[in-house]
Amino acid sequence: MGTKEFLEWCTEEVIRYFNSRVDKTDNKTLKEEDVFVVWNCKTLKNNKALLSTTVSDGLYYEFTFNGNSEELYMEVYKKWENRCINL
């Protein structure tokens, strides 16, 4: 799977995941322009990407494509805190 195809699949999956779980009282549905790629990498036959959205829920979506086994994985994380630690 090429990088472009992989990132398109990731974006579609974030939209599908969010829209199937969002509270209906929020009156929000995600569209393609609400999803962005934070980071991505392709090594040999494998792809990995970290995506997020314009929604202020702190969720990150990590995707991995294992090119050897032709398997796709999605992990969803919640950013709990970001703080500076002085050394």
Where are these regions (language model features)?
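N-terminal trafficking/processing presequences and adjacent post-cleavage segments
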Residues: 1-22
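Intrinsically disordered, low-complexity regulatory segments in eukaryotic proteins
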Residues: 26-33
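Amphipathic, interaction-prone secondary-structure segments
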Residues: 34-71
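A short, surface-exposed interaction/processing loop segment used at functional sites
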Residues: 69-87
